[in-house]
């Protein structure tokens, strides 16, 4: 199983994303290879908020199209719920405290904790995940 960050979903969905072809191909290959994918509700919210936002895109995505993209992943038979456990919460708090995190970095620590406790790689274009000791993560846009 891999846990997807919103930026992977956005890149795979939006044709105007600079890494669209690579991220779409990666996501399609992952599902074709039978690898389960997960993302917490927070990632779905971020995805929908960003791709439909008129201040982010000149031509924001229609909500129905964006929801359809998420529903297709969920209906693939390979979608798994990302568990939010007490251990994940404690790891999240510890990383926030120990790394002195605030703002957007708190969200990153949350995703990292969910992935770490699920013992699966976090897939993101955000290089900042390297700071979370013990987290397995990868950036498919950087892979060659």
Predicted regions and their residues:
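Short, well-structured N-terminal submotif of metal-dependent ribonuclease cores
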Residues: 1-39, 54-68, 118, 144
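Acidic active-site catalytic centers that drive phospho-/nucleotidyl reactions
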Residues: 5, 108, 126
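Short, flexible helix/strand-to-coil boundary loops that buttress conserved ligand/catalytic motifs
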Residues: 13, 51, 133-136
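Short beta-strand segments at enzyme active-site cores
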Residues: 38-41, 82
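Active-site-proximal, substrate-binding regions of enzyme catalytic domains
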Residues: 52-79, 86, 95-97
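Active-site neighborhoods of divalent-metal-dependent phosphate/nucleic-acid chemistry enzymes
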Residues: 78-123
């Amino acid at each position: 199983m891999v846990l997807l960050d919103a930026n992977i979903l956005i890149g795979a969905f939006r044709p105007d994303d600079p890494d669209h072809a690579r991220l779409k191909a990666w996501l399609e290959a992952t599902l074709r290879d039978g690898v389960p994918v997960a993302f917490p509700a927070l990632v779905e919210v971020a995805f929908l908020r960003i791709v439909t936002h008129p201040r982010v895109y000149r031509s924001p995505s229609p909500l129905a199209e964006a929801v359809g993209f998420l529903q297709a992943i969920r209906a693939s038979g390979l979608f798994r719920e990302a568990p939010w456990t007490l251990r994940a919460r404690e790891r999240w708090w510890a990383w926030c405290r120990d790394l002195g995190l605030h703002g957007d970095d708190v969200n990153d620590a949350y995703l990292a904790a969910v992935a770490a406790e699920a013992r699966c790689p976090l897939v993101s274009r955000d290089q900042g995940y390297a700071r979370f000791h013990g987290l397995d993560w990868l950036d498919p846009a950087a892979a060659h």
